[in-house]
Amino acid sequence: DQDSSKKAISQIQEFLDDYPGSEHSKDADKLIIELRTRLAEKSMETGKLYVKLKAYDSAIVSYEIVINEYYDTKFFNDANMEIIRCLALQNKKDEAKQFLTDLEKNEQSVVTDSFKEQALSVIKDNS
């Protein structure tokens, strides 16, 4: 349940704030990372379900949650790629290319040559 995971993260963070030097700090940090990763994975799964239903705008919202809230998880790049795919599947090729360009300019994201190549292939293959 996402609400209970979010509540747990909040409570663990509160513990870390109250007891920064605790011997349990490392375990608490690991638990937060694990819970955030689970929440990101759930949003990715929701996005994939929307894609299957051809509800691309809803899928994009799910992927944006990963990008905006769970940017520090392993799903960050996948979420960006899936937004590009959703735009391409809606024949919004120019928007997909602009999204990639904006991503390249964003200081927080690292767009590798491999990612860019894959994104351009996704745009070409899905539009």
State the predicted function of each range.
Residues 1-127:
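Acidic, polar-rich low-complexity tracts and alpha-helical solenoid repeat scaffolds
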